[in-house]
Amino acid sequence: MAHKKSGGVAKNGRDSLPKYLGVKVGDGQFVKAGNILVRQRGTRFHPGKNVGMGRDFTLFALKDGRVKFEQKNNKKYVSVYEE
């Protein structure tokens, strides 16, 4: 039984792909309907006026206008105000 036992297997050596989360537009910036405003995990930012939320909590503009970041009741809201 002159067999050599197989070596161990490396358990490191993998890396997850980047998720590109975060705020995509600045306060006061003009956006068009459908533009993505925030990509997030969970509701760090809540949808305000003229802002919709996708299944993955992505916030997007429903109308053309200027972006406004607001805070009410200890919650952060992103709104789009038409000009």
Curated annotation (Swiss-Prot):
GO biological process, one term: translation
Organism superkingdom: Bacteria
PROSITE patterns in alphabetical order: RIBOSOMAL_L27
Key words of the record: Ribonucleoprotein, Ribosomal protein
GO molecular function terms noted in the UniProt entry: structural constituent of ribosome
KW Repeat (keyword) present: no
GO CC terms: cytosolic large ribosomal subunit
Any Pfam family: Ribosomal_L27
Family statement: Belongs to the bacterial ribosomal protein bL27 family.
Name this protein carries in UniProt: Large ribosomal subunit protein bL27
Source organism (scientific name): Thermotoga neapolitana (strain ATCC 49049 / DSM 4359 / NBRC 107923 / NS-E)
Gene behind this protein: rpmA
